[in-house]
């Protein structure tokens, strides 16, 4: 079946991961240190231990509002996201690829990032996408499972074989969607891996899609 929809992962695919890394690894420990009167090093150790206690198999892991409550952090998490807006960086080729592919296909975002983050991260890019899906926010799932992809296909009214997807997680962006018949590609920006369904930037992905679809 001809392709109708092209799906993109978010962090590491469309934008650099710096925004989330700073919030989870620096800002939250910094606020915790301020609240508890700790050094940043000790605060980071305690906060990371709290993260591990929850673990990434639970939706709370991804929920910044939950962590502000759990850690009794000062301030408003929304203000923190706004304060870090300036570090958001799309990869250089992203806008051009979206402009060109958007002329032929419906474009969507499928991410396991919370919607609160996505809304900030997508500033300047939102116009390209007909739908933006967050696994934890929209479906209460912590990973991009086969069930997650099936629900997306139902919502956008397309068969899996008419959707392409690209992302930087081997299992959740490549193996899982590919097992359902999607034209999935693993994005390896570091260039360490090579293969017929491995691409190293989104321009290479675009070229593969155009070859596939004639």
Kindly label every feature range from the protein language model.
Residues 85-89, 109, 140:
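Short, surface-exposed alpha-helical recognition segments that flank or form part
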Residues 2-96, 116-117:
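N-terminal helical cap/lid subdomain that shapes the substrate entry/recognition surface
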């Amino acid at each position: 079946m001809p392709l109708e929809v092209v799906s993109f992962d978010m962090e590491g695919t469309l934008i650099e991961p710096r925004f989330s890394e700073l919030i989870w690894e620096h800002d939250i420990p910094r606020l915790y240190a301020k609240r508890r009167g700790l050094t940043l090093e000790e605060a980071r150790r305690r906060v990371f231990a709290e993260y591990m206690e929850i673990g990434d198999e639970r939706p709370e892991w991804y929920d910044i509002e939950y962590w502000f409550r759990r850690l009794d952090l000062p301030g408003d998490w929304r203000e923190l996201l706004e304060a870090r807006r300036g570090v958001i960086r799309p990869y250089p080729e992203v806008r051009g690829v979206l402009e060109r592919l958007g002329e032929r296909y419906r474009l969507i975002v499928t991410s396991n990032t919370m919607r609160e983050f996505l809304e900030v991260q997508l500033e300047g890019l939102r116009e390209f996408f007909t739908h933006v899906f967050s696994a934890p926010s929209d479906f209460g799932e912590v990973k991009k499972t086969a069930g997650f992809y099936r629900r997306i296909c139902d919502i956008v009214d397309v068969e899996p074989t008419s959707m392409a997807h690209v992302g930087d997680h081997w299992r959740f962006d490549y193996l899982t969607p590919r097992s359902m018949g999607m034209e999935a590609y693993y994005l390896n920006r570091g260039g360490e891996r090579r293969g017929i369904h491995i691409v190293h930037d989104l321009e290479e992905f675009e070229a593969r899609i155009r070859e596939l679809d004639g």
